[in-house]
Amino acid sequence: MSSLPPFVTTLDLKLAEKLLKDLQQQGFSITIPAYTRFSASKKGLTCTLYTSGKLVVQGKEQAHFIEFYLEPEILESFGFSHPTTKIDLTPHIGIDESGKGDFFGPLCIAGVYIQANQFSKLQALGVKDSKTLSDKTIRQLASQIKNLCLYHIVKINPAKYNEIYQDFKNLNHLLAWGHATTIEQLILQSGCQTVIVDQFADEKVVLLALKRKKLDVNLTQRHRAEDDLAVAAASILARQAFIDGLEQLSKEIQIPLPKGSSSATQKAGKEVLRKWGEERLRSICKQHFKTLDAILGKVGK
């Protein structure tokens, strides 16, 4: 039995479907006891969402589950693991990316510079980590952020992505180049050299990319940096660029292309292969993903 007391919070029921889907993908067994939307359980952990919106998490694995999944992905707050988190109101640049885990579509890195008088305006708009927002809301907020703040977006479409990847041979190095390029452009626009980045690799990777561009930056890298308002705004712009790019590719080939790299992605990829051929398939995907081998039937060969 867990020595920790149950973790209890209130969840917006609009997030119930996402939570349920995520838990199923994580291997939880689902039941529907009375007065609940569902109860999900696996070894060492139970997560129950009641029809009132009350969410109860208990079990010996609850701390890891809450800190690394529930807070960043669902609650978008860090009271359990970071109870003293405060909003940084110092003018600074925030950087985030979208598309690195998606087989189809572009890789997008965005940066947003926020001045002191803009924080309250962004808060009032409801700016927060894009992972908690619908595509419709992301597009609405992206337009408002662009009207309010200085920003820069590096959008690398699949064909260019594959070409650049051949040079870097490593996704983290490619991402670091994209981050450094975005930072460089926003420094030129704003004159601000204080930057917060959602950390995706060893800190040295981004520092080296900045050094190559001869950039002197007051850089903070941290995991789950989307709790910072500038990074959250950047995550929205990066996501908007990604979903727009994916939608455009879907229109071009007349096949809906899913996000991620799931079985649905493989199914869509095989349809593209049948309709358009291997060359066209390669032009709209990230070729180093193992998903491509699965689509082409090369797994285990």
Swiss-Prot record:
Keywords: Cytoplasm, Endonuclease, Hydrolase, Magnesium, Metal-binding, Nuclease. GO terms for molecular function: magnesium ion binding; RNA binding; RNA-DNA hybrid ribonuclease activity. Manganese or magnesium. Binds 1 divalent metal ion per monomer in the absence of substrate. May bind a second metal ion after substrate binding. Pfam families: DUF3378, RNase_HII. It is found in: Cytoplasm. Residues 90-301 form the RNase H type-2 domain. It is an enzyme of class 3 (hydrolase). One of its GO terms (biological process) is DNA replication, removal of RNA primer. A divalent metal cation binds at residues 96-97, 198. It catalyses: Endonucleolytic cleavage to 5'-phosphomonoester. InterPro entries: RNase_HII/HIII, RNase_HII/HIII_dom, RNase_HIII, RNase_HIII_N, RNaseH-like_sf, RNaseH_sf, TBP_dom_sf. GO terms for cellular component: cytoplasm; ribonuclease H2 complex. Its EC number is 3.1.26.4. PROSITE patterns: RNASE_H_2. Its cofactor is Mn(2+); Mg(2+). Belongs to the RNase HII family. RnhC subfamily. Endonuclease that specifically degrades the RNA of RNA-DNA hybrids. This is Ribonuclease HIII. It comes from Protochlamydia amoebophila (strain UWE25). The gene is rnhC.
